[in-house]
A protein has these predicted regions:
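N-terminal and secondary-structure boundary signal
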Residues: 1-301
Length: 301
């Protein structure tokens, strides 16, 4: 998608119909989102604390899947992948909460070994007992599920670990995307399916992402906006901004909607309703889209 095409689609998105979404809240039922500024480790810890602690989501002896973006063989300064210290901090917190095992998983787009090495995520997690970082590139690791609420998708093959009842925490990075304008939490769900190419070639990708979000529902989304790839996404190189933010919430649409507001994309500011897959997800009742109607806790780490 060219910059011009994204701008055109974004402008059209504001004219689409609107449907209210469900309510979500965080610690003490006061906030929809926690937005914490600071360095990766401190801000991530503060965000987990602000949402009531990781123990709200991870119980003793549970197995956990962390889904960062590590699809590209890029170092963290490219902002094409989730910051390794953000991932490691969350993984450590899960184990401290009593998790039996933490699997850090992604279906990488590029060569698995290079992705694991260059993103720094495997290195950051290697000394945390019970944490395993894996790139799943074989079909045997995926299982098929039906999508009852799908408009263009009837079924999809997803990580088997999701089907096995693991706690799922989505840890996307904030970046632009050539096909969808931005890539945040909902777009990042595509890293958990086998056949991503069909989203690009067979379906309206924005509708397909929203369909996918009806069956893959992370218990928690933590957006890494310590850096943001404001152009040239998803793989870069491009313009890298440094908001130094961590955004955490239960509502994936709300997290992404705030993410849209963090930096200008392609040199222009956008509203969440101008991002088609977010608007469609909101219309499906998957979350709140208007950030001026969200209760947001903002703090510094």
């Amino acid at each position: 998608m060219t910059r011009r095409k994204f701008l055109k689609i974004a402008a059209a998105g504001t004219a689409l119909g609107l449907v209210g979404g469900p309510s979500f809240s965080l610690a003490k039922e006061e906030y929809d989102l926690a937005v914490i500024s600071g360095q990766p480790v401190a801000a991530t810890r503060k965000a987990l604390e602000a949402i009531g602690g990781i123990s709200r989501f991870v119980k003793n002896a549970q197995r956990v899947v962390l889904k960062p973006n590590m699809s590209f063989a890029r170092t963290p300064d490219f902002s094409a992948t989730t910051h390794p210290l953000v991932v490691a901090t969350i993984a450590q917190a899960c184990m401290e909460a009593g998790a039996q095992q933490v699997l850090v998983l992604d279906h990488t787009l590029q060569r698995a070994e290079l992705c694991l090495e260059r993103t720094g995520i495997r290195e950051a997690c290697k000394n945390i007992p019970g944490v395993h970082v894996l790139a799943l590139q074989e079909r045997k690791f995926f299982g098929e599920i039906k999508i009852p609420q799908g408009k263009v998708l009837e079924r999809v093959e997803v990580f088997k670990e999701i089907l096995d009842g693991h706690v799922l925490i989505n840890i996307p990075v904030a970046k632009s995307h050539s096909a969808t304008g931005v890539s945040l939490g909902l777009k990042g769900l595509m890293g958990m399916i086998w056949d991503r190419e069909s989203f690009h070639s067979q379906y309206n990708i924005n509708q397909a992402i929203a369909d996918l979000a009806t069956v893959i529902k992370p218990q928690l989304t933590i957006l890494d906006a310590t850096r943001a790839l404001a152009s040239g996404g998803p793989g870069g190189p491009g313009e890298v901004k440094k908001p130094n933010l961590i955004v955490a919430g239960i509502d994936p649409v709300a997290v992404d909607s705030y993410g849209v507001s963090i930096v200008p994309w392609y040199g222009q500011n956008f509203r969440s309703r101008q991002v088609e897959h977010l608007l469609v997800a909101h219309q499906k009742g998957l979350g709140k889209i208007d950030i001026d109607q969200l209760k947001i806790l903002k703090e510094k780490a």
